[in-house]
């Protein structure tokens, strides 16, 4: 049954509960229930629909994130460690059903069988097997982190597509192929069986023909390198997974013993853009982490004395372009978009000047309350959209000090230095009002039509809390915002779904899963008109859900 959309309480400004002054907050509500273990709901639950869901909106919103944070007496330390919980909101002719299932990864099954944490995760070192003797437990510390058997297959970050099939992935060498109808794992895939990489990102890019590109790492006896990966669009055999994948370019790290940690990369029609940022992975610390009784995350540190470097690769030839582009230190977890214009690559990112966010996402921090929670939030960096310009054809005769950007519509500059490098200064794609929203993350665009092209709009979550507390539409041309927020609710990454056949950049709807720590309220799937950012409807589900990471919409 569909119900008229009632008037819900919204934030219209600062309240006595929360006061935001340029990122400084007091009185943040505790969100610990959003970061605790929940039960799966494998049988479809009919949602109570308020307002309306467009009749053309037929398909499934798939989401994934951590949903279990302990086994027996063992507890995970970091938000990124929780066991993968798959969510499905299925929409058909205005009705909505929900289900969720824990991914039956080898890690999940081994932990469940032993009732303890058997496999180490990003921020948690597995406990030694109590059934082994002292010598066996000691020797188990010497298994290298890069070895496939030592890596988790708890793929809890994103759904990705290769050759028409969907996979769950994180940043290790393992992916899990999934049946998007049943949410059941069908196959475990190891990247390293096909190409020489130890892992790849959870944010590949796609050409219109389905060719996929990704960034990975190679870590072995010959050192460390970043890898650009290409996966062909078509299967030769129905049983294929990532067969035919190729490494088309290898990039040596600027600092051999301390390569950069990265979460995503950029792509235009012709180029891959990879950013080496001063969030460093200390290879010695990582290689000796088990011996020292430390988790993988102990080997990652923010080193703001180092600048950020941009690498540009021709994705057709695999050639690394000679330009040496640098900027002041920042961290970017998510790229917004990138495109080419007048001999330049323009790249838009969500950037933070404080790279300690991985430390902030320790579960003990996220679950704090009162003044301690305020202190954690106020110590964290904020993420803001910035534009950089990378001129591709730099003349050796270009005078030192010249701004090499020919683009009149951006204040981003690229200035040639005496040593031939190019110093890139960004343009802010926002005004002061976004600072009052706590910045923005989880950026999304109309990917199918505007990825790698000049664009105007993107969508994301505002962060006046440690998790997203609003949805925001950003106009990067006029630098204006539209905001949706509701008191006591926390929306997930927005997913843009276009009206069938449209080429309009905001011609469609935004889907977001909105959850609350209040046990007397229902979580819901929200649908907004992407143009005016007004609510069209919501589908309430009386099921506890944790705050997750990423997802995708798959039309029927």
UniProtKB/Swiss-Prot annotation:
UniProt xrefs under Pfam families: RPE65
Binding site for Fe cation: 203, 263, 334, 550
Matches recorded under InterPro entries: Carotenoid_Oase
GO molecular function terms attached to this record: 9,10 (9', 10')-carotenoid-cleaving dioxygenase activity; beta,beta-carotene-9',10'-cleaving oxygenase activity; beta-carotene 15,15'-dioxygenase activity; metal ion binding; oxidoreductase activity, acting on single donors with incorporation of molecular oxygen, incorporation of two atoms of oxygen
The enzyme's E.C. designation: 1.13.11.-, 1.13.11.71
Cofactor(s) needed by this chain: Fe(2+)
GO biological process terms, semicolon-separated: carotene catabolic process; carotene metabolic process; lutein catabolic process; lycopene catabolic process; retinal metabolic process; xanthophyll catabolic process; zeaxanthin catabolic process
Record note on cofactor: Binds 1 Fe(2+) ion per subunit.
Catalytic activity from the UniProt record: all-trans-beta-carotene + O2 = beta-ionone + all-trans-10'-apo-beta-carotenal; 5-cis-lycopene + O2 = 5-cis-10'-apo-lycopenal + (3E,5E)-6,10-dimethylundeca-3,5,9-trien-2-one; 13-cis-lycopene + O2 = 13-cis-10'-apo-lycopenal + (3E,5E)-6,10-dimethylundeca-3,5,9-trien-2-one; lutein + O2 = (3R,6R)-hydroxy-alpha-ionone + (3R)-3-hydroxy-10'-apo-beta-carotenal
Keywords of this entry: Dioxygenase, Iron, Lipid metabolism, Metal-binding, Mitochondrion, Oxidoreductase
Chief location bin: mitochondrion
Compartments (UniProt record): Mitochondrion
GO CC annotation terms, alphabetical: mitochondrion
Keyword Mitochondrion: yes
Annotated function: Broad specificity mitochondrial dioxygenase that mediates the asymmetric oxidative cleavage of carotenoids. Cleaves carotenes (pure hydrocarbon carotenoids) such as all-trans-beta-carotene and lycopene as well as xanthophylls (oxygenated carotenoids) such as zeaxanthin, lutein and beta-cryptoxanthin at both the 9,10 and the 9',10' carbon-carbon double bond. Through its function in carotenoids metabolism regulates oxidative stress and the production of important signaling molecules.
Annotated family: Belongs to the carotenoid oxygenase family.
Name of protein: Carotenoid-cleaving dioxygenase, mitochondrial
Gene source species: Macaca fascicularis (Crab-eating macaque)
Organismal lineage: Eukaryota, Metazoa, Chordata, Craniata, Vertebrata
Gene name for this UniProt entry: BCO2
């Amino acid at each position: 049954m569909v119900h008229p959309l009632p008037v819900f309480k919204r934030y219209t400004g600062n309240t006595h509960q929360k006061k935001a002054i340029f990122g400084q907050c007091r009185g943040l509500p505790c969100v610990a229930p959003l970061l605790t273990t929940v039960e799966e709901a494998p049988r479809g639950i009919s949602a109570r629909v308020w307002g309306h869901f467009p009749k053309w909106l037929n398909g499934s919103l798939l989401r994934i994130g951590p949903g279990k944070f302990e086994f027996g007496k063992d507890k995970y330390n970091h938000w990124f460690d929780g066991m993968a919980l798959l969510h499905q909101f299925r929409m058909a002719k205005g009705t909505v059903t929900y289900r969720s299932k824990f991914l039956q990864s080898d890690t999940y099954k081994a932990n469940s069988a032993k009732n303890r944490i058997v496999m180490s995760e990003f921020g948690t070192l597995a406990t030694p097997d109590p059934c082994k003797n002292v010598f066996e437990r000691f020797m188990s510390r010497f298994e290298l982190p890069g070895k496939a058997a030592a890596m988790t297959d708890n793929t809890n970050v994103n759904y990705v597509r290769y050759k028409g099939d969907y996979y769950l992935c994180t940043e290790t060498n393992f992916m899990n192929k999934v049946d998007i109808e049943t949410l059941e794992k069908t196959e475990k895939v190891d990247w390293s069986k096909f190409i020489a990489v130890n892992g790849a990102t959870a944010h590949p890019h796609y050409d219109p023909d389905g060719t996929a590109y990704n960034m990975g790492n190679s870590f072995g006896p010959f050192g460390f390198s970043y890898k650009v990966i290409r996966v062909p669009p078509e299967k030769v055999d129905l049983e294929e997974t990532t067969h035919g994948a190729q490494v088309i370019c290898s990039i040596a790290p600027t600092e051999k013993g301390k390569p950069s940690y990265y979460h995503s990369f950029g792509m235009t029609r012709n180029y891959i853009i990879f950013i080496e940022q001063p969030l460093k992975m200390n290879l010695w610390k990582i290689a000796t982490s088990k011996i020292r009784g430390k988790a993988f995350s102990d080997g990652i540190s923010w080193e703001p004395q180092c600048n950020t470097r941009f690498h540009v690769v021709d994705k057709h030839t695999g050639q690394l372009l000679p330009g040496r582009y640098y900027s002041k230190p920042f961290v970017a977890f998510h790229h917004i978009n990138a495109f080419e214009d007048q001999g330049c690559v323009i790249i838009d990112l969500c950037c933070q000047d404080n790279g300690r966010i991985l430390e902030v996402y320790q579960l003990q921090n996220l679950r704090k309350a009162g003044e301690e929670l305020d202190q954690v939030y106020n110590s964290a960096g904020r993420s803001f959209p910035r534009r950089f310009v990378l001129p591709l054809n730099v003349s050796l005769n270009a005078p030192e000090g010249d701004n090499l950007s020919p683009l009149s519509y951006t204040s981003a500059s690229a200035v040639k230095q005496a040593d031939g490098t190019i110093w890139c200064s960004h343009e802010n794609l926002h005004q002061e009002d976004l600072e009052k929203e706590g910045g923005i993350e989880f950026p999304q665009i109309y990917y199918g039509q505007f990825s790698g092209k000049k664009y105007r709009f993107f969508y994301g979550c505002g962060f006046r809390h440690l998790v997203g507390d609003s949805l925001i539409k950003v106009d990067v041309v006029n630098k204006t915002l539209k905001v949706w927020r509701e008191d006591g609710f926390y929306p997930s990454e927005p997913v843009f779904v276009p009206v069938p056949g449209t080429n309009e950049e905001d011609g469609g709807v935004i889907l977001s899963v909105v959850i609350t720590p209040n046990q007397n309220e229902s979580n819901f799937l929200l649908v907004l008109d992407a143009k005016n950012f007004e609510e069209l409807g919501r589908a309430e589900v009386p099921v506890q859900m944790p705050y997750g990471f990423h997802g995708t919409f798959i039309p029927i």
